[in-house]
Amino acid sequence: TPIPLMTGTDFEGISRVIEKQTGIPVFYFPTSGMHTYVKGAGMAMETIARELVPAGRKSVKERKNKQENPLKINILGATPLDFSINSTLDSIKEFLSRHFEIISTFAMGSSIEDIQRAGEADINLVISSVGVLAAKALEERFHTPYVIGTPIIGFENVLAEKLIESAWTKKSQTAYFSVLQKAHKKDTANFTTIQNAEAVSNLKKIRSLTETIEKNKVSGNVYIIGESVISQSLKAALALRYRIEATVICPLETEPEYTEKDVLLFSSEEDIKKAITDADTVIADPIYKTICSEKVNFVAMPHEAYSGRIYRKEVCDFIH
């Protein structure tokens, strides 16, 4: 709510009083009600990274045998708004555990004790825009590099390679940039078709991304509307796995560091409606279907930050 800010509430003073009386660390965030969840949740994760993670870590270059000592990783940017309460985050963890030792997840499914170990990680994976500020804070404090990208089937193995590369070079990067640059040059000959080893039968009733894309016959002039990191990772996955090019429209806050130049940044439905007049296929939360032409092949990708819990049962598992 913007009311405390409008009335000049002394957040810092209140925090000091409560902390003194209880002995519990207290933090405040200057929310104004004028931004999206990306900014608010991002500030919260950054504060956790700065205030709750003690100093002390061992450099990856001190490891004698990287096979006997798997690289340690934090997953940053996990919230129910972006990853719902379905199998996606569990699938991401299961995939990463094949290559890395997962220290903590900011901020679903990890205890305070897990998060306090975040400084031990060799590499941080930012799976949504919400985790970028925390990644920068951990890089500043512990010199831990980070990679931006969401593990999505067709793109997940490329992302794993980028994580290992950054852990050893100590250079942060946005994983989908190299994939999308090749796609722009029409140079798809060197793209690797990713084969996922997990059987679809294991999904039970969970809706898989593979099933969603193939069943809806995604083709033609494709637009993806959604959160910046997830949408661009999906764009990379479509290019790698299906040779499909897509245009991303992001209605949320985003930064040039992890946003391609051709991403369309629109906050109003009117602007988005104008941008997709030539669309053959639109991949987005179901609330956007009302602004699409009846001729458009609309592929529903529910996102709780947009439509809440209405379409939760239809949320896809990104790894399958």
Language model region names:
Residues 1-320:
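An N-terminal assembly and electron-transfer interface module characteristic of large anaerobic redox
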